[in-house]
Amino acid sequence: MNIMNAKKDFKFKTHTCKIDVLGIEKEITYNNVIWISPNKLWILYANDDGIIQVEKFNDVYCDYPLMYDNGDVVYDGYLNIPKYVKENIKRILNKHF
């Protein structure tokens, strides 16, 4: 799903955090941030190509939410995404697409 297809403009933010990569602390900046979970574990953002991704902080994997015409949202990967994260993503995507 490409952000360029959105009905309304997202209010993007930038988020910088420190992550541990093989014992080395690195600072990473996410651009085009759409939503961050209240516990700061999950982030929904658009990558540089405009593709929406959901990612768990300090993890090397991400997932791509896909929305059907009827508003249902599914995921193409195998991340164990909590229900509250899925519900927020569905609410956000249904509002904008």
Model-derived features with residue positions:
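Negatively charged, low-complexity tracts enriched in Asp/Glu with abundant Ser/Thr
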Residues: 2-26
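General helical secondary-structure elements
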Residues: 3, 82, 86-87
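Short acidic DE-rich linear segments
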Residues: 93-97
